[in-house]
Amino acid sequence: MNKYSQYVVQNPKYEVGMEGLVKGRQCPTMTYMSNELVPGSNVYVELGWVWDIPDPNRIPEHQHANSDEFVFHLGSDHNNPEDLGGEIEFVVGGETLNINKTSAVYIPKGVIHGPLIWKSYTRPHIQMTMILNAGTLAEAAPAGYKGE
């Protein structure tokens, strides 16, 4: 093993959501970075493929009191990588954002965000969240997870 191989995650954890809980998207999603996977990383990164309008079609309102968050929506068309392959309505701080291109949204700690709702869908895309200063699922609390 070389010096930095301990920082490479090729086998994610599947810990956010239960299989069959949401139709039209990967569930559970894949956790690619956490203190459990890379001790001391102190960041939580999870992602999942969306292959249809999810059902239920709603990520609920929530906030991260101690952590900044980035939410990415990544299109899959290699000929037009900026095209998301769908349209999403995302409420951040009480303002509605309409997203139809590959994008990154910065959400400062403490800002209430959600719901996030798909309005249309044309091709698979990836939804990814990165929560800083949160090294565990319980600290990150993605999608309103409360440890239940």
Question: Which residues are covered by each model-predicted region?
Answer:
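A short, N-terminal "cap"/entry segment at the start of jelly-roll beta-barrel domains
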Residues: 1-60
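A short beta-loop-beta micro-motif enriched in histidine and acidic residues
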Residues: 55-70, 78-85
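Conserved metal-binding segment of the jelly-roll/cupin
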Residues: 96-119
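Beta-strand-enriched cores of mature, soluble protein domains
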Residues: 19-41, 68, 75, 116, ...
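Short acidic (Asp/Glu) patches
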Residues: 53-57, 92-93, 109-113
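Extracellular structured ligand-interaction cores
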Residues: 67-71, 85-87, 96, 125-127
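A short beta-strand-loop-beta hairpin characteristic of the jelly-roll/cupin
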Residues: 75-100, 138-142
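Double-stranded beta-helix
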Residues: 1-12, 18, 118-148
